[in-house]
Amino acid sequence: NMQPYIQIGAGKNNTEYSKLVGILNKYRKENKVIFTIHQSIWLPSDDFYINIASSDRQIREDSIKCIQKNIEFARDIGVRDISFHGGYATDKLSQEYEFAPLDSQNSISYEEAYDNSIDSLNKLKKIANNDIKLSIENFNFRPERRYLFSRVGDFDRLPEGIGVILNIGHLYYTQKKLKQDNYINEMINALSNRVNEIHINDNDGSEDLHKLVGDGKIPIKEILEQIVKNRNIPHLIIEAHRNRHNYSDDDLANNILKLREIAKL
């Protein structure tokens, strides 16, 4: 008997804070749902893109503040899980529109970026103070976009107490990109005990398409089976690109039912 699980994703909030908290708490209690938060709706400007790995002090500080505001927001609306991106090996990022390719400016070394990211994560861990679980997302392997945290060894320095939101679409895309048939197995073996949530979407291996479950080639049931070998199933979130693929409300509702069947492991 799964309790509905709704992720508040990245975007822009135009509602006054206390009013928004009231609306969400009313909805949560009346509908018995669990909320979770991904990235942030608290950005300093519309074109700001969170990068906790930046060497630009202002961008890194503002990025940490975005997540800190999330932690405060989480405490006010009964959220236990927050997830976000571990960063990029670049000082500044921009994006023309949601889900467009990120434009990296002022690249920095991966070593420097990981140092910055780990430092930011340790700061955020103190702010979360063990009552909010923090997770970073595994990225696609795309060096041209300066992504961090895409291969097994990238997670070796992840601070204790920081979890992972495992994106199955990113796993499959990266396995095909690296041409490493054992990549998904190795990632799950290395990270399964740290997985707090799972982003589920489908693709054909050629691109990170974020399609609904069953619309691509990913063996989603088999991947979930491997994750739950030695643990309970984490919370599952369908993360599909509604506008790009012209999905209707019915498409989304039916896909939730489809995932519930797949997740009966």
Predicted regions and their residues:
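A short helix->loop->beta-strand "cap" motif at the edges of active sites that frequently abuts
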Residues: 31-33, 132, 230-234
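Distinct, well-ordered alpha-helical segments
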Residues: 1, 17-24, 95-97, 119-128, ...
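Alpha-helix-loop-beta-strand connector modules within alpha/beta enzyme cores
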Residues: 25-40, 120-127, 158-160, 220-225
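Active-site-proximal loop/turn and secondary-structure-junction residues that shape catalytic pockets
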Residues: 10-12, 41-43, 86-90, 138-142, ...
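Active-site acidic/histidine proton-transfer and metal-coordination neighborhood
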Residues: 53-163
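Histidine-acidic metal/acid-base catalytic patches
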Residues: 61-80, 91-97, 159-265
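A structural signal for short, well-ordered beta-strand segments and their strand-loop junctions
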Residues: 7, 35-37, 81-85, 133-137, ...
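N-terminal pre-domain/capping segments
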Residues: 1-70, 75-76, 162-165, 264-265
